[in-house]
Structures are given as structure tokens and as C-alpha cells.
Amino acid sequence: MADDLGLDLGKKKKSKKVIKIDGDDAPVETGVEAVEDGLGELNLGAKKKKKTPKTAGEEVVEEKVPTLEIGIGAQNLIDAKGAWPDYTYEEALTLVYQVMKDKNPDFAGDKKKFAIKLPEVARAGSKKTAFSNFLEICRLMKRQDKHVLQFLLAELGTTGSIDGSNCLIVKGRWQQKQFESVLRKYIKEYVMCHTCKSPETQLTKDTRLFFLQCTNCGSRCSVTAIKSGFKAVVGKRAAIRRAEEATAGK
């Protein structure tokens, strides 16, 4: 039908706009084509990088960013290789221990742990407690049984003795944790070195004082004397009272 009527229903083409300037016979064209014609051979595309030619027998070496070494050997905060990194407290403490181990290789190893056997406790009758491996623990601590027994009875505030089967019989009802607590206190005071915490020590007596001599670090210090604990007066109260009244009446 459009052909019969002679109509053109297609898209209308844009016509070039021509601007005439007074005094100039040549028309000026506008639009994209005019701009492109004016630029000529000017190329506004991305500039390509030029590749450097490789010569025969030459290897390409990549430049690596230098990393800061640990700051142990540096004398100042800023050394020849650059500034120290910011260390946290834990990292700085690790560096200090590392320097100490490097300067003192003898103390670089782990500390030896001193372990003893647990007390073997059982009932001995209705009012007594048997400590069967008392002498064995004394040998492990390398201490005289008389000294350990004196400290044990003073801390518990009771009486006791070693029977014929080398078993300690203590008056009263006691549990294993109570004997263990007293032995820990004894080890801390009379076995472990007060300077380096080593169990390799010797307990010696000079005049009336006891001294703890360490074979590891060589330190020597005095230890406290054993003091008797609280002792309850159970019997003979009437006799004691009469004796006090008799002395007061005189």
C-alpha cells in the first residue's frame, strides 16, 4: 500500500547542518564526521607498552621488594636496612627470651619437673592413719626422714611414729590430700632452690641453722626453722588446774 501511495515509511536520515559565516564562502560542517575529519591522523586510543628486546644469553631478573629482617642484631631503632617493624608485647617478649637463650646456652633447655609419688594412706584402727610409703618419699626428696617427720607432725598438729614395718602411724583421721598439701609445702621450703627452682639441692646444718645449698646455680640460703603447731591439751586438765591453784595460793 505504501508503494501504491508513493510514501516512504523508513527512518528519516539526519541531514548535515551547514552553517554559513558572513564573509566566508566555504560552509562549515558540524557533527561527528566533521570532528573526525578535523583530527586527521590523531589517535586517542590507549598507549601500548613497548617491549624491551631480550638479548641472547641474558636472563631477565625480577626485582624483589626487600623484607626487613628481625631486629635482634641491630644496634639502633633505625639500622642500615630500614626501620624496625612495630612488635607486639608477646613478640618483643619472645625476642628477649631468644636473646637470653643465645647468650646463655646452658639455660636454654626446659626446666626439670620434680615429681614425687602420691601418699598411700589407709586407716589404722578407728583413731589412727597409716602412711605406708613415707620412707620412699623421703628417699625421692633426698631428705632425712626425721626432719620430714618433724615438719609433718608440726603442720598437722598431732603425734606419730614409724612402726616396725617402716610405716608411719599418725594419730587422728587424715586424708590423702592433707598429707599431699604438707609435702608440697615442705618441697617448696626445704627442697627446691629459692633462686633457680632446681630440686638438686642439699640441706646442711651449721650450728643451729639449716642452709639450702644448690648444686645447679651454686646459691646458698638459710631456711626457716620448724615450728611446732597447735597442740590441744586433752587429758590431765584437773591436775594442771590444781597445780596452778597451788602455786597461786603460795
UniProtKB/Swiss-Prot annotation:
A zinc finger (C4-type) spans 193-217. Disruption phenotype: RNAi-mediated knockdown results in a reduced body length. This phenotype in suppressed in a ced-4 n1162 mutant background. It is found in: Cytoplasm, Cytosol. Its main location: cytoplasm. InterPro entries: IF2/IF5, Transl_init_fac_IF2/IF5_dom, Transl_init_fac_IF2/IF5_N, Transl_init_fac_IF2/IF5_Zn-bd. Belongs to the eIF-2-beta/eIF-5 family. Eukaryotic translation initiation factor 2 eIF2 is a heterotrimeric complex composed of an alpha, a beta and a gamma subunit. This is Eukaryotic translation initiation factor 2 subunit 2. It comes from Caenorhabditis elegans.
